[in-house]
């Protein structure tokens, strides 16, 4: 039995964020994008934005523990092109939890 668990842990797919590019946002207009975590074998314990690579002012990422998705929503306040890092991890079971991260560029226009 232990051998089967070890084989499964070693061969399971790595989770990844299904959204590869964020759509263009507009100042003063509501914005919402669902970010799914693909290939997660367990629930997602956290999905966050790195403080060093934040979302534009007015946008935030929300996530409920165990959900395999998060949502970026809000209303952007300033134009620009922003580098954003979204990262997270899955819960562990017999196998250790797995990490996921994705760099994005988000453009905010008038």
Placement of each model-derived feature along the sequence:
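An extracellular/luminal cadherin ectodomain-centered signature
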Residues: 13, 45-50, 72-74
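Low-complexity "stalk/linker" and mucin-like segments enriched in Ser/Thr/Pro/Ala/Gly
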Residues: 52-70
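Well-ordered beta-strand positions in beta-sheet-rich domains
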Residues: 71, 101-105
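Short, solvent-exposed loop/turn segments at the edges of extracellular beta-sandwich modules
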Residues: 90-96
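Extracellular/luminal low-complexity segments enriched in Ser/Thr/Pro
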Residues: 71-81
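Solvent-exposed, low-complexity, repeat-rich "mucin-like" stalks and linkers
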Residues: 1-8, 15-46, 104-109
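Beta-strand-rich interaction surfaces with strong enrichment in secreted/lumenal proteins
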Residues: 21-23, 60-62, 73
């Amino acid at each position: 039995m232990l051998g089967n668990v070890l084989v499964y842990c070693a061969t399971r797919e790595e989770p990844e964020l299904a959204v590869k590019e964020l759509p263009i946002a507009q100042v003063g207009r509501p914005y919402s994008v669902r970010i799914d975590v693909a290939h997660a074998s367990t629930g997602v314990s956290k999905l966050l934005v790195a403080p060093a690579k934040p979302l534009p002012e007015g946008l935030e990422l929300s996530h409920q523990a165990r959900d395999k998705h998060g949502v970026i929503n809000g209303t952007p306040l300033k134009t620009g092109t922003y580098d954003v890092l979204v990262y997270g991890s899955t819960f562990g079971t017999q196998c250790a939890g797995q990490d996921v991260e994705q760099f994005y560029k988000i453009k905010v226009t008038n």
